[in-house]
């Protein structure tokens, strides 16, 4: 609303993409018998942006939402992101960098 007619955002796509951008992690990782988490066989071959995009398409979500999921991480760097995709990417990176600093990974 702040940018008016010059810069349109689809709030439904933005919200859906923000909520579902990491949905692929549900199948990228699995629990071991001792309760630890490890990469699944699928996760060793496909990172969560790709598996998440496939899940979105499989379940009939709009291609615009699948685009946000597919391009929210480093795999989307250098590609044309939708305005909603740019917002989700930047928020995800801010969150990731904050978590890295919090746990002392830098």
Residue ranges and their predicted role:
Residues 3-106:
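Divalent metal-dependent catalytic cores for phosphoryl transfer on phosphate-bearing substrates
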């Amino acid at each position: 609303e702040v940018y008016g007619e010059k810069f349109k955002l689809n709030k439904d796509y933005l919200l859906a993409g923000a909520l579902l951008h990491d949905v692929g992690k549900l199948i990228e990782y699995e629990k071991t018998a001792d309760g630890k988490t490890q990469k699944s066989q699928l996760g060793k071959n496909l990172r969560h942006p790709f598996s998440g995009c496939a899940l979105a398409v499989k379940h009939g979500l709009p291609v615009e939402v699948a685009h946000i999921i597919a391009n929210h991480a480093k795999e989307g760097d250098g590609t044309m992101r939708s305005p909603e995709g740019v917002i989700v990417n930047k928020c995800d990176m801010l969150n990731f960098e904050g978590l890295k600093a919090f746990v002392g990974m830098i």
